[in-house]
Every structure is written in C-alpha cells, then in structure tokens.
C-alpha cells in the first residue's frame, strides 16, 4: 500500500511560507537559495617545501560580496597532488580575507594531515569543503593554504585545480 501527502504550502511556526507548489510540480522556496556563485579552474603546478602555511597559488582565490550579513558561503576545491618522497604529509587550510583586511585561517587547527604518503611516487586528489558565515557585506575572498611535514609536495602536478564559491541566502 502506498501513501500520499498532498500539500501546496509548507509554513514554519511563524506562519511564514517556506515551500510552495503551483500544483504542476513546480516548487519555490523562500529559504536556502543560492544568491551568487563563482568558480575557477586552471592548470596548477606548485612545488611546496614550506613547513609554514603558505598560499598554494594566488590564482586559487575566489571572491564574492555578500548580499546580506546573514548570508552563508560554501567554498569547495579539489586538485591533484604528487608526493615523490616517502613519509611526507601535508596540511590544508582555508584562509579568508574580508574587505582587504588580511588573510586569516578560518578552518581550524593543524592536528591532522590532509594527505600523507608512506611510499614514494604517489599521486592522489585533495578536496576541501567549508561552510562559513562571515557576517559582513564587504567583499570576502577565500584561498587554500598548505604546509608540508618534510620534503616536497607538488600541488596540481600539472593537473586541474577546480574551485567553487557559493552564497546561500538567509
């Protein structure tokens, strides 16, 4: 036996319309809409030997100006990396700049590797996804930063870097 629940409107406790339907299968929502989106992709090839956090490449930066101080941003990126030496790891963090005030780490501590290879000549993909609520209407810029435990990690390895930044409206 199948059951159906037919409604044309879903409201919250304040009687605000959250989801409406026109009866023909088309729904609209007053919440959780994508306001803006920007993306980039390019061939990345960055050899990193730094044991301090550094920006992978300035071309990795993505910026949007929020429509509201209540907007949420979702940043995601992925890129290949190559480790030529055994027992080499790296840390991956997301840095943010608001209105040109300078970059700061918003993604947390450095207690875990984002990638680690115990043998030589390993190639893999690194991914990062982060949700942020910057509480501003000034331009917000995001960029991934990395540091290695030892040796050299090639970020990109002449492969594609992909990133997307989305504004989710309140």
PLM ranges: what are they?
Residues 1, 6-8, 54-55, 121:
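Mixed-charge, polar/low-complexity N-terminal
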Residues 40-55, 63-139, 143-170:
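Terminal beta-strand-rich extracellular "head" domains
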Residues 2-48, 170:
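Glycine-rich, low-complexity segments
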């Amino acid at each position: 036996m199948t059951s159906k629940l037919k409604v044309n409107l879903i409201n919250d406790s304040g009687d605000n319309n959250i989801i409406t339907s026109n009866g023909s299968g088309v729904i609209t929502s007053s919440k959780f809409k994508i306001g803006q989106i920007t993306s980039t992709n390019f061939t990345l090839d960055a050899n990193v030997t730094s044991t301090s956090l550094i920006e992978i490449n300035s071309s990795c930066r993505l910026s949007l100006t929020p429509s509201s101080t209540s907007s949420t941003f979702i940043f995601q990126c992925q890129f290949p990396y190559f480790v030529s030496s055994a027992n080499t790891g790296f840390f991956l963090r997301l840095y943010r700049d608001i209105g040109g005030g300078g970059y700061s780490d918003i993604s947390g501590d450095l207690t875990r590797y984002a990638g680690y290879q115990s043998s030589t000549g390993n190639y893999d993909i690194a991914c990062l996804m982060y949700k942020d609520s910057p509480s501003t209407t000034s331009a917000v810029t995001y960029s991934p930063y990395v540091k290695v435990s030892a040796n050299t990690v090639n970020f990109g390895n002449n492969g594609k870097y992909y990133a997307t930044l989305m504004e989710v409206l309140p």
